[in-house]
Amino acid sequence: EYSGKLYATWMHDKGSYADFVLQAGRYEQELEGFDNTGMDKSKADYGTWGFGASVEVGHMFSFDSGVDDRRWFNHWFVEPQLQLSYFLAKGADYTTSTGLKVDQGNADFLTGRAGFVLGKKFNYGTSDDLDRRYFQVALLGGVKHEFLGGDQTISYTGVDGAKASVHAGDIDGTRFYYGVNCDWQVTDNFRLYAQASREEGDRYTKDYDISIGGKLLF
C-alpha cells in the first residue's frame, strides 16, 4: 500500500485558516477463505486505486493572561473546525485460485465533520522576538457523518457459469471521535505531528488510530 497527498493552506494572522488536500493511493489486497463447498481454500490478490479530496476551515480563539495576537505565542486555545471530504475507491476484477470470477464495483464516500481542538501552545521565543517555533499538545473531539456510505455492488461468476451479486457498504450514519495530538513547529517551514484517536457510532467502531508524520511548507 502506498499513497501521496498534496496540501495547500491559507492562514490569517488572526487565527483563521483553510486547508485543501488532494490524495491518491494504490492499495493491495490479499484474500483467503473456503469456497462454497467448504472443502477447498480459495485465494486471490489484487490491487486497486483510491482518490480523494477535502476542504477544512477553522478559526483559533486564543485565551490566557497576556495573550498575544501571534498564533504561535504561548497560550491556551480552542479551535472549532468544519471539514468536507470525498473519497473514491476504484473497483477491481479478479479471479480466485478456484476459478471464481469477481467484479467489484466502485465505492464512494462523502464525509462531513464538525469538531474542535482544545490545547496549549508553548513557544520558544519571547514576546520581544519573532521566533515562530512552538510545541503544542491538545485534546480533540467532534462528530462525523457519512452521506454516501461506500455502497458497492460485487458480482460473482462461478466456473459453471452461475452468477450472483451482493450489495456491500451500509456504513452511512453518524459517529463521534475523540483523541489527543501533539505538534512541534521545528522551523518556520517544517512541522512534526503525532495523533491518536478513536471513533464509534452507527454500525461503525474504529479502534485507536495512531499517525506520525511531518509537513514541509514551501
Name each model-derived stretch.
Residues 1-218:
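Membrane translocator/pore-forming domains, dominated by Gram-negative outer-membrane beta-barrels
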